[in-house]
Amino acid sequence: MEHTVEHKRKWYKPQSTLSEVFLPVPYNGRFGYILEDTVRAKGIKVAKFTAIPEGKYNVGIRYSNSFKRNVLVLYTKIIEKNGYKEYVIEKDGISFTYVLVHGGNTHHHSDACLLIAKNANTSGEDFVIQGTMENELFHIISSYIKNGDTVIWKITNEPQKE
């Protein structure tokens, strides 16, 4: 069975992007907010300061040495290197490795990863999110993956929302 996470980018500032995330049935309505680095023009990447391009990505589980726990990871392909799996996103002529979904509060915590939280503050120079939803999201999505289901993360750039 295939499950799709809907990630809708709606608010944009020079250094950060704020989105709403919706989970597959049986969850109804917005699950939380995603904070990322800025969205750039197609094919443009500034390392650690660029959101991944809009599109569809596979979702997997990976142990993070930085966080010392399993986390969700987005990818378009997996490269085996010296016994390790490298999760890579290649799209529009640019690539990203280890795009994780984890907690954080500002775009400074992102480095191209997706930060998930319950609350968002849109005032101020940059977006701020609070109340991590990482554990809840991991529990839901990992249960699908552990059951052998496919999970797709679909990102859409919508027009700026007021």
Outline where the language-model segments fall:
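Cell wall/extracellular polymer interaction/catalysis modules
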Residues: 1-151, 155-162
